[in-house]
Amino acid sequence: MSSIKLLMTWDIQPGREEDYFEFHIRKFVPALEGLGVALSEAWLTVYGEQPRLLAEAVMPSMDNARQVLDSSAWQDLGVQMQELVDNFDYKLVPARGGFQL
């Protein structure tokens, strides 16, 4: 069984930064932890035409990752995210050391 990275990207909607950060701390991170997903890295894009934020979580297996992504809790979290961010996207990749896109 190989570890899997959940890579998530998004742009905070202009003027919604305060609402986003409150949501992130009070709901997003606790909801992920409730699903057994712990964020391990996060990056902010300061130059270029890429999503403003990239966050990653390492999961123990593809089966575990699929179970999380198929859950109603994950779907609900995505709906809440879309109210505050644009271009929310995610993908699963085999975990390697270091930064991954």
How should each PLM-predicted stretch be described?
Residues 1-2, 101:
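Basic/polar N-terminal segments that are highly enriched at the extreme N-terminus
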Residues 4-11, 56:
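Active-site-flanking beta-strand signature of metal-NTP-handling nucleotidyl enzymes
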Residues 11-23:
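Short, surface-exposed ligand-recognition loops at beta-strand->loop->(often short) alpha-helix junctions
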Residues 23-40, 58-93:
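An amphipathic, aromatic/His-enriched active-site/gating alpha helix that lines ligand/cofactor pockets
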Residues 42-45:
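Short, solvent-exposed loop/turn elements at beta->coil junctions and helix N-caps
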Residues 47-51:
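Short acidic/glycine-enriched loop/turn segments that link adjacent beta-strands
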Residues 93-101:
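Short, low-order "capping/linker" segments at domain edges
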